[in-house]
Amino acid sequence: QCDLRYPTMRPILFIMAMQSIVFCEKYDAQEIMDIGKRGDNYRVWLYFIDKKGSIPIVVDQRTIGRRSKNGVETNGLWYDLTVSKNYIEQISSLGIMVKNESRWLNAISVICTLSDIERIAAFPFIEQIKPVLGYQKRSDIEYPDISPHSRDFDYGNALEQIEQINVNELHEQGYTGSGVRILVMDTGFKLTHNALREINVIDQWDVVKDDQETANETDEESAVGQDYHGTAVLSTIAGNQLGEFIGVAFDSEFLLAKTEDVTQEIQLEEDNYVAGLEWGEENGADVVSTSLGYLDWYDYSDMDGNTAVTTIGVDIAVGLGVVCVTAAGNSGSSSWYYIIAPADADSVISVGAVWEDGAIASFSSHGPTYDGRIKPEVCARGKQTWCVNPNSNTNYSRLSGTSLACPLVAGAVALIIQARPDWSAMEVRDAIMMTASMADSASNTYGYGILNAGSAINYGVVAGSD
């Protein structure tokens, strides 16, 4: 029998129950607890339903030109509209820390508690809440102790890796990367080595700490070698010390983004990756080199080119005219031997690693993607690659990993763009794949083979047209 003293109680309880169901549909609590946990809190993406009150950002003139070349009109572009400041303010008013904003995903990443998530879900402008995927980075570079020595030619010991991908031919034609802007995203960058002191750095951003210092800033960072990996990677592109070491695209302009925090248990955060990518694109990057990858929490079925946040970010960047180059991964000898995100993107150039003689490195990750596409795209020297020793201002080392193969290809891309400035991002990618050493017999070990930069610039070019 109905209690007439509380005539509205049941409808109210029903409404509350329905609201709870709606809120829970916005997120999977177990998924957030399993994946998003960071210490006592959780790191999650908040996806918004719209961009209400958004305004367009101001992008570099180079960005406008690059987009136009790729058929993209900047005026009114949705990707340039900021995330709603009103929505962010309402989230911040709860005392929640906002880590990153993504115009491309129309989302922000935050650090919060589980009870915060319940309150956030009640906002009508929240479309979905997902955990930020992180990666507990395992050693992906082999660090042998080799005494440096040089040869009697200008490239020094870098000659072999330069000749293997036929970059020397482009250097001889005067293509050294001049006028091309490269974004390198990594752990940090120490620019005190003799081979790096003269590089043309346009801007730097530490995404982790939100400042402009990408070298080690703390004793803890120095102790764990925060900027070691990034410095070695950068040197293969930008290094220039005549007779000792010459990188692939030493005359290029550089944007440097520090997107990893190796002092933490979770070192690679996908929201930092996307933030760095958006920053580079709006600041005129023509090429992106990322020797970073994400595997934890993903299944092979997720390597379909459409699932991982970093993969989606890369596809957007390429759509805006940026050539994105990424390491295939170093899982070739493990139970998971496939490529890792964002190498599964259908627009990226993923890079495998080979020895000096062209044999595949055992650690180099394989394809195919879950939907059957060949991976990697191409290969370059990733076993005993010659680069600067980040612990010294004068010495060099031989290091191994697809992390070292990736920047060699990214540097070559810069030379191709310099030689063929009218080519779109996908035309550059096609040229690289179709002129590689195994283009007629591509496989999921080598992809389309070892890059041939000298042939790539002539792909599809009619004789006498230059």
What does each model-identified segment do?
Residues 25, 39, 128, 169-205, ...:
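Subtilisin-like serine protease catalytic core
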